[in-house]
Amino acid sequence: MAKKHRLTTVKRKELRQKESEALKQLQERIKDYDAKTCRAVTFQDLPISSGTVKGLKEAAYIKMTDIQRAAIPVALKGHDVLGAAKTGSGKTLAFLVPVLEKLYHERWTELDGLGALVISPTRELAMQIYEVLVKIGKYMSFSAGLVIGGKDVKFEMERVSKINILIGTPGRLLQHMDQSVGLNTSNLQILVLDEADRCLDMGFKKALDAIVSNLPPSRQTLLFSATQSQSLADLARLSLADYKTVGTMDGPSSKNKPATPENLEQFYIQVALPDKLDILFSFIKSHLKSKMIVFLSSSKQVHFVYETFRKMQPGISLMHLHGRQKQTARTETLDKFSRAQHVCLFSTDVVARGIDFPSVDWVIQTDCPEDVDTYIHRAGRSARYGKTGKSLLMLTPQEEDAFLARLKGKLIEPSKLNIKQSKRKSIKPQLQSLLFKDPELKYLAQKAFISYVRSIYIQKDTEVFKFNELPLEEFAASLGLPGAPQVKIKGKKSIEKAKELKNTSRQLLLLAKANDDGEVDSKEKTVRTKYDKMFGRKNQTVLSEHYMNITKTGAADDDAGDFMTIKRTDHELNENDLPQLTLPTSKRGQKKALSKKASLSSKGNPTKFKFDADGVPHPIYELEGEEEFHKKGDVDTQVKEFLSKETEYMARADTEDKQLVKEKRQEKKRKRLEAMRREMEALQDDDDEYDAPTVAYVGTGNLSDDMASGDEPDFAPASPPPRKKLKGRYSESAESPDTGVMEVEEPDTLEDLESLTARLISG
């Protein structure tokens, strides 16, 4: 084998000195760099390391965009950054380059652990960031990892302790912080939030707060998004006190410009809710040579529209993507859509942010977005990196005026399009025929109807989304249904709670129910025979219980007008279960029963008391007199004192609760680490006790004959115990010259085998 060339000690010292000098020069360049005077055009003009420049050049990133030119120098100087720029302006490189440079300046190694954390709201965006990082960090000696839902958690746990740059979604990152023993965030240098406004909203609030509580406050924080939040409460949660606001949307010149790309042509059409699918199908039929994304409000709608349009064959490839799909299917769909030229993708907002699809011609928003920020992110999937693109928004007459006013407030004024009647085609008869033939499609249509109605109900902007004015019967007929299905709508609080649970990791929910040792009580699994499975089998498609509940007829409603309804049919009564109706036989018993009734009736309702320091009882809720109340001051003063007192108490209790939760989490991790250590020690003890060193006795001089006896036992029953080798000049005389037997250890590697062969040949 060819030996690796190793540097001498002197050369190693020289190399380290050169690296130290280059790093000092680079740090001086960063201090002297002024973005206003030094108008950098390419990445090579920036004070960054040669490895980063080389990686950017090989990945074809030469010239900088406006957000990169503004954000990278500020981040290199160690400031916290709040970055905002239009969609498709290159925000990913604006935070990945400072991440690499930060760890390079700190001379980060694998032994230092986690140095940078990048949080993304969606799995697809996290995968895209990871791919870009691998490209530009090719010549840097850092390890990077991706942790997202839908992947093997145990596989990630084994490797997460050796990662320097970790990219992931909030739920999976929090799960690793709670479960992975090797993940240590106490030495974190930089935190990045991509699409920060989405990460800071209610859906990820608890997960993000828990993640930030595990991070050191001395870190550098970078926040990037196309629609940035400057709420003081949100920034305080991330410990952003002294930060710099950068971006193309910051400054006096940008105040009169919209937040959408300049090359994006924006249109809208007024269409009634029952006519939306007709217009959508007609639009797809007239744009067969285009690449388009169609946004719908729920995964059920995406599934229904995809299945029905696929059967009607509009003449273009159709794909669908939503959050309820498996991760492998989502990744495969993203890859196919990126490589396709003429294709239509039906999707929810799971790809509305950050995802870079090449050459998207049209973005169609079939359902009205919940706010202007969502509109900007959806429309931003087209016209990226200076290319042209078009956006089409469908608005109902109830939504038109209010939502256009919201858009005008952000300087966005889409042009109105009129639909040609010759291009319009009704697909309602085809949908009715499909639903009549296929009960599963009918089930999907009912679920799509229910999910759309619920999505309108939970919207906060009631001026745009008018729930009471929805034409439900006409909308159901447009989906091919004979009538509007029953919709059970819970309160908004329960819906928001369900939405919050949707973004929470299932493993984290299980871990929350764990005991102090971190163990989750699992139900004992009973053995099910094939007969149990056969009798307990249910149809999971058409005749499922959920399907029957939705499609049940109105027979039950016919009896609703009856005055009395049957709750239970006639059944036999067990006499043993009936109570005794006889009175007490003795006079004493009768008197006792009567006295109890009399005493209870005279006592009245029970009351509870609390005792003061002197032992005097007082009712729990005791009202003060008017004079006593006014002695303490006026109402406003007392309210302020009470609020300040309670606020101080809640803040103190909140700090104590956070500290307690942190200590419990650390204790759980410590116990798991201790259990792993004991397990490793037990395995080592077993190896020391049973695994004696294997010895091969070579006496023939023919290595192939001696090593071929692999089927024979390793130890002969009468073999002598291994002898200790003698050192010095007596080592040769220790071997017996008469027998010609030489004692050696069994070769483990190829190098050991080569050295053993050379010794045997030399005799």
Swiss-Prot record:
Keyword Hydrolase attached: yes
Record Pfam families: CTE_SPB4, DEAD, Helicase_C
Record: residues binding ATP: A85, K86, T87, G88, S89, G90, K91, T92
SUPFAM superfamilies in UniProt: P-loop containing nucleoside triphosphate hydrolases (SSF52540)
Residue positions of motif DEAD box: 194-197
Region Disordered, annotated ranges: 574-613, 681-763
Bias (Acidic residues) ranges: 682-691, 743-754
GO biological process, one term: rRNA processing
Any GO molecular function: ATP hydrolysis activity
Keywords on record: ATP-binding, Helicase, Hydrolase, Nucleotide-binding, Nucleus, Ribosome biogenesis, RNA-binding, rRNA processing
Q motif (motif): residue ranges: 41-69
Cystine bridges: none
EC top class named in words: hydrolase
One CC-aspect GO term: nucleolus
This enzyme's EC code(s): 3.6.4.13
Annotated ranges, domain Helicase ATP-binding: 72-246
Biased composition (Polar residues): 577-587
Catalytic reaction equation(s): ATP + H2O = ADP + phosphate + H(+)
UniProt subunit comment: Interacts with the U3 and U14 snoRNAs. Associates with pre-ribosomal complexes.
PANTHER family, per the entry: RNA HELICASE
Role summary: ATP-dependent RNA helicase required for ribosome biogenesis. Involved in the release of U14 snoRNA in pre-ribosomal complexes. Required for pre-rRNA cleavage at site A2.
Family: Belongs to the DEAD box helicase family. DDX10/DBP4 subfamily.
Protein name from the UniProt record: ATP-dependent RNA helicase DBP4
Organism (species): Eremothecium gossypii (strain ATCC 10895 / CBS 109.51 / FGSC 9923 / NRRL Y-1056) (Yeast)
